Curated annotation (Swiss-Prot):
The lineage of its organism: Bacteria, Pseudomonadati, Pseudomonadota, Gammaproteobacteria, Vibrionales. It comes from Vibrio campbellii (strain ATCC BAA-1116). Specifically methylates the adenine in position 37 of tRNA(1)(Val) (anticodon cmo5UAC). GO terms for cellular component: cytoplasm. This is tRNA1(Val) (adenine(37)-N6)-methyltransferase. It catalyses: adenosine(37) in tRNA1(Val) + S-adenosyl-L-methionine = N(6)-methyladenosine(37) in tRNA1(Val) + S-adenosyl-L-homocysteine + H(+).
Amino acid sequence: MKSERIQTKGFKFKQFSIHGGESGMPVSTDGVMLGAWVNCIPQNKILDIGTGTGLLALMCAQRFPSAQITALDIEITAIEAAKQNFAQSTWSDRLSLHHSDVLQFEPEHRFERIICNPPYFNSGEQSKQSQRATARHTDTLQHSALLNRCHELLTNEGTASFVLPITEGEQFITMALQQGWHLSRLCRVQPSQKKPVHRLLFELAKQACDTQETHLIIHSSEGYSDDFTQLTREFYLKM
């Protein structure tokens, strides 16, 4: 008896839509924040590691009109959804998609920017949907191996941007510094003024640099905060 295939809820943004397909990877606030926060210049070659349904790649395509974006994922249902989302966007000529593990991926060039919403569950707990388990279990792509591979794939002036829960993010940053990376940007994110920091947005550089630190509160007493609205207004329909 075949298991029931669960459709993942889609999401409509101002300039593109996300079809979830059977990916098990719904649009998340983490992903939207990272895609809106990442620093690039228009001509950059960008690599999106673990693209899922293609959200980060599409956000970068919208924000940086001349950027060439390469997206990878190891999960075939994610690739199928991302392929549809890329084809339906106005930037399909600047988006390339590869069904590949980044550890085995051999591009023809290095990248100026890498963007990644990495797996972070270390507890071994299993998801009800195997695709989401693949997307989120650290043993699929160990953070140390991810950092090493990012270092190899970046140009000397390149940077890599990530979003993680605070505990995993602090551990990831510590590991990166031990491996010779430099922390160029760090944003601490709170759900609201009364709740503690729960996410870190951060950018790692290969070259020595000062760290630019900022703070973001998502919700105010009246809804989304002004800072969150300013960050994401190019994307969310009701901003």
